[in-house]
């Protein structure tokens, strides 16, 4: 084995950053000299201000390029009516959220900060604490949600009440700037991050593409498509692979080279990206309820690997594409410019709030009457819900199961009303509710049969596809699963939710059981009482096309 001369290869060689920034302030930074070199001195207040503003902006606004992609769906003749309906709701939601009161999504996420600190930047230490203070200030002062649970022991948890801890990863680099990527990562999209340990045998044109298409299909719709999908093939370790997935889904590596070299530089395979995007469009899942727009775009990054390993990673950034860059240099603190006026992307003829044909459902009736009405319509029927809905999610369902297991039976409210899987953000002053969109339905699948057997949870409302056990339970017990659009939580809070009150377990915060009154709350029948599943029908349609 011959030796080669030393050559250092930057693993992720990026071109110039063309991101558009705005100056937050020129305070809290200064320039000094040490041993003949100019040093950028950054006060802790600068880090706190940067984190505070970045997470505020990302909670209420999205990138212009993302908004343009959503708007393009409305003009695409190949987009389904459901694609266009969902896209319009996203734009309306962004228009409301950009006012800075109701956040884009009720799951205001885990705060993730990736920082790269130049060697000629001095802060005096305590960077993580200063950044965490900024995250704290954002979540305390804005109408966001506290989603972090701290373990007291292996099984008992308590909500931290601040949305801390944040995930803060800081790196030392060359230069005299301090650069950041801030991500508000919701649970739905975070849960769609996967690592597969494969081998060299996968790395053939005939196998790799089909493999990635099948993995892409497993994403389903629970994480609020259209997605920004990222695949990473290779990596010097599993953790390097998944870190790259996260950053690629945030467009952080868009300026990588498009070919590799003998030293192991990362690169994008743009041709494979194009091919996979076409395959995503052909899946038929569309923007949640069937159609073309399962993905806005796809990134495929190839990394070097150990000869015995071939990690493959997959992840997404969802319709709440909350990624924002920031930096500190000698001019001051800079924040990436997001879209302040998303309403401009809504065509004039679609500015009025009319939703077209929908079946009106009065929920303030006996459950048997509501079920009988729903039974008249096929899956995919669009509904307009009006009346009382119970709101409960993961811990609430665990509490209800505990009651059933102890022989206590179910509370009457879970029998009399539909249940909406959700957890509200803080309620702004003068509003009936904070942002309150649906959470992922699949996490509650294991509870459905037991609940419905006791007359509860007969109508469920949430987002995304569900497992066969839910379809079987609904057929057995006469229940329904209704789909709500994942993503436009601000629209629902402003337009559909008229009141919100806690019913039980207030100590659980957003995981408590709530009651809401709604008007014209949009939903679709996804699973009915006859064993029909909307998403299974889409898959069968696609399989039939493949056979032909």
From Swiss-Prot:
One of its GO terms (molecular function) is fumarate hydratase activity. InterPro entries: Class-I_Fumarase/Tartrate_DH (IPR051208), Fe-S_hydro-lyase_TtdA-typ_cat (IPR004646), Fe-S_hydro-lyase_TtdB-typ_cat (IPR004647), Fe-S_hydroAse_TtdB_cat_sf (IPR036660), Fe_dep_fumarate_hydratase (IPR011167), Fumarate_lyase_CS (IPR020557). Catalyzes the reversible hydration of fumarate to (S)-malate. Functions as an aerobic enzyme in the direction of malate formation as part of the citric acid cycle. Accounts for about 80% of the fumarase activity when the bacteria grow aerobically. To a lesser extent, also displays D-tartrate dehydratase activity in vitro, but is not able to convert (R)-malate, L-tartrate or meso-tartrate. Can also catalyze the isomerization of enol- to keto-oxaloacetate. One of its GO terms (biological process) is tricarboxylic acid cycle. This is Fumarate hydratase class I, aerobic. The keyword 4Fe-4S applies. Pathway: Carbohydrate metabolism; tricarboxylic acid cycle; (S)-malate from fumarate: step 1/1.
């Amino acid at each position: 084995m011959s030796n080669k001369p030393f050559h250092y290869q930057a693993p992720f060689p990026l071109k110039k950053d063309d991101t558009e920034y705005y100056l937050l302030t020129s305070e809290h930074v200064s320039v000094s000299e040490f041993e003949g070199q100019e040093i950028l001195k950054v006060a802790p207040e600068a880090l706190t201000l940067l984190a505070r503003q970045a997470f505020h902006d990302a909670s209420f606004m999205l990138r212009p390029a993302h908004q343009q992609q959503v708007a393009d769906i409305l003009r695409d003749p190949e987009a389904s009516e459901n694609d266009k309906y969902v896209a319009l709701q996203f734009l309306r939601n962004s228009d409301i959220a950009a006012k800075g009161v109701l956040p884009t999504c009720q799951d205001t996420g885990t705060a993730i900060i990736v920082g790269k600190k130049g060697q000629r930047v001095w802060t005096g230490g305590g960077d993580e604490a200063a950044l965490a203070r900024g995250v704290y200030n954002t979540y305390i002062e804005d109408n966001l949600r506290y989603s972090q649970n701290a373990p007291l022991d292996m099984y008992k948890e308590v909500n931290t009440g601040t949305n801390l801890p944040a995930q803060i990863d800081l790196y030392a680099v060359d230069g005299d700037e301090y650069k950041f990527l801030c991500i508000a990562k919701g649970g739905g999209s975070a849960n769609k991050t996967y690592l597969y340990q494969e081998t060299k045998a996968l790395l053939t044109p005939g196998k790799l593409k089909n493999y990635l298409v099948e993995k892409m299909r497993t994403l389903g719709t629970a994480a609020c498509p259209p997605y920004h999908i990222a695949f990473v093939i290779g990596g010097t370790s599993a953790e390097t692979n998944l870190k790259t997935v996260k950053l690629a889904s945030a467009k952080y590596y868009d300026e990588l080279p498009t070919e590799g070299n003998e030293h192991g530089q990362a690169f994008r395979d743009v041709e494979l990206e194009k091919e996979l995007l076409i395959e995503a469009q052909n899946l038929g899942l569309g923007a949640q309820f069937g159609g073309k727009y399962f993905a806005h775009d796809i990134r495929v990054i190839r990394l070097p690997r150990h000869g015995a390993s071939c990690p493959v990673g997959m992840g997404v950034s969802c319709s709440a594409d909350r990624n924002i860059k920031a930096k500190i240099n000698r001019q001051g603190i800079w924040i990436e410019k997001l879209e302040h006026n998303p309403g401009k992307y809504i065509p004039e003829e679609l500015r009025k709030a009319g939703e077209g044909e929908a079946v009106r459902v009065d929920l303030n009736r006996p459950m048997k009457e509501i079920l009988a009405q729903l039974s008249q319509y096929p899956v995919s029927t669009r509904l307009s819900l009006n009346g009382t809905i119970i709101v409960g999610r993961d811990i609430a369902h665990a509490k209800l199961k505990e009651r059933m297991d102890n022989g206590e039976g179910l509370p009457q409210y879970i029998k009399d009303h539909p249940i909406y899987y959700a957890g509200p953000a803080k309620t702004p002053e003068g509003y009936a509710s904070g942002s309150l969109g649906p959470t992922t339905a699949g996490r509650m699948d294991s509870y459905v049969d037991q609940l419905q057997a006791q007359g509860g949870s007969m109508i469920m409302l949430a987002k995304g596809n569900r497992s066969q056990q839910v379809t079987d339970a609904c057929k057995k017990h006469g229940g329904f699963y209704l789909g709500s659009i994942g993503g436009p939580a601000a629209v629902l809070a402003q337009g559909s939710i008229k009141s919100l009150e806690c019913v039980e377990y207030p100590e659980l915060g957003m995981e408590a059981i709530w009651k809401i009154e709604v008007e014209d709350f949009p939903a679709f029948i996804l699973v009915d009482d006859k064993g029909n599943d909307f998403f299974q029908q889409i898959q069968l349609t696609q399989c039939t096309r493949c056979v032909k």
